[in-house]
Amino acid sequence: MSAISSALLWKKIRKGLSAGRVQSVATRLVVDRENEIRAFVPQEYWTLDVNLNRAGKPGSFTAHYYGDPQKRELTSEQDVQSVLDALEGQPFSVTGVKKSEKKRTPAPPFITSTLQQEASRKLNMTPRRTMMIAQQLYEGVEISGEGSVGLITYMRTDSLRISEEALAAAGDAIRSRYGAAYYAEPRRYKPKSGAQDAHEAIRPSNVALYPEAVEHDLTKEQYRLYKLIWSRFIASQMTNALYDVTAIEAACGSHVFRATHQSMKFSGFTAIYEEGRDDEQEKLDSPLPDLAPGEALTASGFDKQQHFTQPPARYTEASLVRAMEEKGVGRPSTYATIVATIQDREYVIKKDKRLSPTPLGVVVTDLMIEHFNDVIDVEFTANMEHQLDEVEAGKRNWKAVLREFYKGFHAEMEEAEEALDGKRIKVPDEVSDEVCELCGRQM
């Protein structure tokens, strides 16, 4: 499929292009996201906060408007003003105090996709660079007094399986380094649906080789990646982090405001590792005073803020890998290559760590959708991946799979050749944000 459809791109657009089955879908994900962003219509909304003081006692706090009393969105300044008018000069009181304990469980050890995502977030490494350094750690590094040592298990895997020996070694390391309170029992993680499970999860080959013990034998990148893998694996076997959560509800008439605060009770796995995030972390309220239901409060000020809903974010390399994994597109051995290839082919460009389609990427994707819609369909590609897995497992005949695919693809190819006969597709010039000083147009 790749060679045939690539030949069509060569003839109709320009030489050097390719339309691999998975890379075409990866490019389409980026193009589709850009279309979502361009079609997005921001929606106005407002937030309203109140600063509340205790009557005759020290301690103030900020609460956020919730509703009257059911949850209500403030969609205009008029909505906010109607609430403020109702609250003017009126007393508040505490209508609810809820205290609870919240637990956070550690993330499982790395598989290929999550290693690439986390190395991108925390180490600013591209998927391709991550896999190159991981390959070095797997194949072996010269360790003083030890010779060449493979520091990690195989790095192309979608399995969460951990050997019993590694589980026991992790438990010993945790008890020795952090204390018995940080280890309860081995954690065995369930594999995700469709995982091939040929290899273990990515982990240190020898847990006893602490990162700092081998740091002087490693390059900076090798050390940082090894430390990330070691820490994630050890954290995956540690106890939960525990938090004390206090939720306050205050009301004035029918209008309800809420405030929540959480404080760490026991660090658990967070003593060594916390998973990175692609999105902004939710802001938590400041510590709250020790309030009782029915307690009187007075408002000392209000803060109203206008906001607009935001379009979906462009993919980072890490979030594109995650999207491919979630949709069943590609395999652990191909994620890094695919993300790199669509940039090398100039279908996608990276700016400020975010991926955008180029005019060429849009043209190629539109052409593929118009003439090879099944092939570039995400579900079709995921299903093809599943069929290829079954071929590899001996459950399906490869000739039958190929015959079934080629029958539909050949018909689409003939139709495309006929529809595009004699036509040459022009790629629009890319327009930048810079303005020409001479003519005033965008360059």
What residue ranges belong to the model's regions?
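Glycine-rich phosphate/pyrophosphate-binding loops
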Residues: 126-132, 143, 148-151, 335-338
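Core structural elements
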Residues: 1-6, 22-24, 50-54, 102-114, ...
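Phosphate-backbone binding and catalysis cores of DNA-processing enzymes
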Residues: 1-101, 135, 201-258, 263
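Basic, low-complexity terminal or inter-domain segments flanking catalytic cores
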Residues: 39, 76, 80, 98, ...
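DNA-recognition alpha helix
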Residues: 114-122, 135-144, 318-326
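Conserved short loop/turn motifs at secondary-structure junctions
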Residues: 13-16, 99-108, 118-125, 153-162, ...
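Positively charged, polyanion-binding regions of nucleic-acid-associated proteins
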Residues: 89-105, 117, 301-310
